[in-house]
Amino acid sequence: MLCHPARSRLALATALLLAMASPAATRAEYPMLMSLQPVAAQLGQTSENTVSSRYNLYGAYQVLVSGSKVTATVVAVPKTKDGKTPSLTSLKLKFTVAADALPGVRDFRLATPRGASTIGQIVIVADPIVNETGNNNSTSTAQNITLPATICGAIEKAEDVDVFKFTATKGQPLSFHVRSQRLQDRIHDLQKHVDPILTLRTAAGTTLAASDNYFFADPFLAITAPADGQYTLEIRDVRYQGNSFWQYSIQSHNRPVIETVHPLAVATGTDVLLAPIGHHLGS
């Protein structure tokens, strides 16, 4: 019986691929980046951030960051005494951000002996980074912060509620921009994503504002402080779920926030007066 030439070639190619595959090759998984802690870095500063992954990061030798004026290096890992290759699923990176770098979200990858990693993301911000610390799961144990700041933390376990307190004066504009769920869109192997909700309360516990899904699933609040005094800001998952990979940043300040402009289109060769649309823009 004659054998079809195309089928013969396909069978031969399959056999060659199977023959080339070895246990060593199947173990060389490229790293899948899962989170960065803290997930933000400040303009004009150098910071150490811890990246976590599935599969081994040992031997990572280069960090590739999108855009310009943001660079990163791998913090050296001591060699093991027995000479064996350790299984390393977290690594410290040193990010250096120029003072005139463009704020916003940057992609980054790690180059490793097992190939390039999946994409991670870092938020470049103007204000100082404040990291979540200690037990801040209730109003009575709320973490004290000073605005402006970018709050970084994680909704790391079930029923985790992170509460922060600050003072404001009557008439002071306040805005709070959460980045969390949107940062998870690039995570290759995260099976369930965060759904954060943000709530602003008075010292007496009265809810002034709450936001759930403003920018996709991420909250945003803009409000004017109704009185002098202390306020609390609470972030949690709307389902009270948690995961150590669910990192967040909350840009908290009193500056104007522009969301868009009108009109969105401008014809070439014409002068157009653009009107900003957003929050706390004044008159």
Q: Each predicted region: which residue ranges?
A:
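Boundary at the C-terminal end of the N-terminal hydrophobic targeting segment
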Residues: A24-A28
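Bacterial N-terminal signal peptides that target proteins for export
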Residues: M1-A13
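Acidic, Ser/Thr/Pro-rich low-complexity intrinsically disordered segments
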Residues: E29-K81, L88-S90, A99, P113, ...
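Bacterial N-terminal signal peptides
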Residues: A11-S22
